[in-house]
Curated annotation (Swiss-Prot):
Keywords: ATP-binding, Kinase, Magnesium, Metal-binding, Nucleotide-binding, Nucleus, Phosphoprotein, Purine salvage, Transferase. Monomer. Its EC number is 2.7.1.20. GO terms for molecular function: adenosine kinase activity; ATP binding; deoxyadenosine kinase activity; metal ion binding. It comes from Rattus norvegicus. It comes from the Eukaryota. Belongs to the carbohydrate kinase PfkB family. Its cofactor is Mg(2+). This is Adenosine kinase.
Amino acid sequence: MAAADEPKPKKLKVEAPEALSENVLFGMGNPLLDISAVVDKDFLDKYSLKPNDQILAEDKHKELFDELVKKFKVEYHAGGSTQNSMKVAQWMIQEPHRAATFFGCIGIDKFGEILKSKAADAHVDAHYYEQNEQPTGTCAACITGGNRSLVANLAAANCYKKEKHLDLENNWMLVEKARVYYIAGFFLTVSPESVLKVARYAAENNRTFTLNLSAPFISQFFKEALMEVMPYVDILFGNETEAATFAREQGFETKDIKEIARKTQALPKVNSKRQRTVIFTQGRDDTIVATGNDVTAFPVLDQNQEEIVDTNGAGDAFVGGFLSQLVSNKPLTECIRAGHYAASVIIRRTGCTFPEKPDFH
């Protein structure tokens, strides 16, 4: 064939060997509009909120959202844990656009339109399942000092349906294009069957499946769903509070975070070609990383405490930074360095927002 004589292959060699394709990173979760405000202790007490927690809204929180908007100076940001991480990863990757894919459910309303436009602005390839039974989900971020208490009203986010969205050929094709998958544990409360379908696909095709413990209540009240997916998890993320709750629920009988990481790393695993890695962040304290060989502590970047504006999204940003390097098969130390960098940028700004370009080398 004449085509074989054309000097096309040569041109390819000049390009970076790790050139990324669109949709290389896949995320699925709860798309929420964050409504954040600096509040006082009285407000937290009134709604019996802990200063640093993530919970799902109950009946007693019905008035919270209205009161937050009326009483305090609020800011609206496109949020939702996994969606935040996809945006940060895409920001760190820069080119190509749409390297990160995101699936989730929204309502057909103003907030839904905001989420769509914000995802497009961030160059994330978002494919929402849109339905009109529930409005787009919101998350109240109640900030006091360096703490944030999150109250999520999932609404539409809770309506994601595997058979109505994930299973559709055009959507599943995007799953097949990815090399790395990330789902926040929060999504186990919505569609565990969707999480399992993606996790199994990753294991069968020797691709990297990553999950976040997300919040203490996931390990407590969604233990069965969490442990059903755990054998498929190649990289597990979490913070120190989530790690402690997970250890207690699993009967690890230790409060030492390194030991918790080691025991979690050793839990049963389906794809034996990949050793599990467990990564626990601890705010300003060292990030703990357990691999098959050892447990290591990585110090975070020195941060002037006065510069910290809003720690909401720091964990999501860490994951986003980490994944941005993982898709290019960078070593673990580089992935962690990128995670620490991204988190350090995000905590100096309100919401999970970032400047135009990263300064990471």
